[in-house]
Amino acid sequence: MTGKRGTAAGTDGSGNKKGKREFKAKLSGLLAEQTCRDSVKEAWEGNQGGQFGSVALDSVPFPHGVIHPFIHNSDFLEELKEELLNLNFQPKSNDLYQFKQSEDLKNRKESHIKALRHVLFEDFRQWLSNITNVELEKTVDISCAQYGYTDTLLCHDDELEGRRFAFILYLVPEWSKSDGGSLDLYGMDDNGQPGPIVKSLVPRWNSLVFFEVSPVSFHQVSEVLSDGKCRLSVSGWFHGCSLERPPRGLDHPPVRSPHIPHDDQILYEWINPSYLSLESQAQIQEEFEERSEILLKDFLKADKFQAICAALETQSITLEKCGPPNKRCYDRAHGDFPGVIGSCMELLRSEAFFLFLSNFTGLKLHFLASNNEESDEGEGPSEPNTVSQQGASSEDDKVPSCSGELRHWQHSYYTMIHDLDPERHEFALDLLLFCGCDDWEAEYGGFTSYIAKEEDEELLTVYPENNCLALVYRDKETMRFVKHINHKSQQRDAKNTKHKGFWDFAFVYYE
């Protein structure tokens, strides 16, 4: 990388070598005052809130503090900002976040970065240790992040062995609540899960937020809504003995049920005839067995699909918000489903559809389904099975089952991968059928990503598309999430007065 400079680095104006200039950052003078320090210490120990010089403390929803100003000399921060913006930032994106992150600042040699590192992990660490009575190690854990338009960091608690206090130093331009990018703090519900947002802290130049990392320290960086501002911050953790954590509650697994009796006629009423032929099903099964996924366009008959879309736009459907926010945020249709919507749910749960999926995928979702190992010995495709055929299942056979829901997606909705997901540790067939996706763009989010365990690279991405049926077979090492739907989606919603976001029928089938 090259650039125009007035003089060469490490020289004076005549080209002679000069000594390397050392910079020193100083904490705000108010932090050093004994009276202020004693008042903050007393308030922290008593779990009290209040303003103490440049330090604002609050215990709701969990103990945290805001220091402004944090650094004595604002000119130092301007030069620090310039150094930081010259670093290499990498885009980071997964189920939890989207932003740009710098390389580790632990060993950077730039003068202002080095000075900031010293003031944080020496001067401020000692100050924080003193007021909290917590012994903090000298471990340096620090990086820089840029949040631009639509970037976010969703609800999490910062849990990681050794992390004791988190901090964020803001280097932002004039910032207001309407710009987004606030640090949102969550309360806790009766089940020990994050509940509603209780407090939002708007970024401010030369302010530092700190809080204790604990089982209740759930927070997020809300989506940045300003298209012309950069939310620049330096953040990290002070390390020490971690707080003891209570066992986490398990998610209740979705209710599974076997198929409901229905003969083949329901398939002919609903499904595009091109998918019902022997040749089509044999070709689809061959492709599915090779790739473990397939997308079937124009899956339902046009009149049936149009009727579903019309019902979703006009009929009253009871929706319940699904959380908690550290795992998911979307609307689930609840209660009795009216008319054609209920009939579609019935189709997806029907005995005929279970066998139909078996013919598509080679999975044994019905006792009449062909055994792949046996059928491989024959020559050519066999006639697809139908529920009108006679047969009996073995008493030792597992009963195939499914769980399913109708979901509504709109701006700010998402799901996340989490360790206690009861669906993570089984082989399963995922089905997604999309509605109301007119003009939906990939940049809005809302797509379903499949990734391998412990990996960030996507194995497969399923984008919402009208009347498309997505089938994905996942093993125990494959996880999935729905990407956060960002502010760009509201441009599309503003043009469409009939409905916001989109819908999907989401089912999971088990052999």
Curated annotation (Swiss-Prot):
One function term, GO molecular function aspect: iron ion binding
Source domain of life: Eukaryota
Catalytic activity: [ribosomal protein uS12]-L-proline + 2-oxoglutarate + O2 = [ribosomal protein uS12]-(3S)-3-hydroxy-L-proline + succinate + CO2
N-terminal signal peptide: none
Manner of cofactor binding, per the entry note: Binds 1 Fe(2+) ion per subunit.
Domain (Fe2OG dioxygenase): residue spans on this chain: 138-240
Sorted UniProt keywords: Cytoplasm, Dioxygenase, Iron, Metal-binding, Nucleus, Oxidoreductase, Vitamin C
Pfam families for the chain: 2OG-FeII_Oxy_4 (PF13661), Ofd1_CTDD (PF10637)
GO biological process, one term: regulation of translational termination
Function: Prolyl 3-hydroxylase that catalyzes 3-hydroxylation of 'Pro-62' of small ribosomal subunit uS12 (rps23), thereby regulating protein translation termination efficiency. Involved in stress granule formation.
Main location group: cytoplasm
Chain residues that bind Fe cation: H156, D158, H219
GO cellular component: cytoplasm; cytoplasmic stress granule; nucleus
Cofactor(s) named in the record: Fe(2+); L-ascorbate
Disulfide bonds: none
Organism of origin: Xenopus laevis (African clawed frog)
InterPro entries linked: Oxoglu/Fe-dep_dioxygenase_dom (IPR005123), Oxoglutarate/Fe-dep_Oase_C (IPR019601), Pro_4_hyd_alph (IPR006620), TPA1/OFD1_N (IPR039558), uS12_prolyl_hydroxylase (IPR051842)
Protein name: Prolyl 3-hydroxylase OGFOD1
EC number: 1.14.11.-
Residues reported in the UniProt entry to bind 2-oxoglutarate: Y170, R231
Gene: ogfod1
Region annotated Disordered, chain positions: 1-20, 372-403
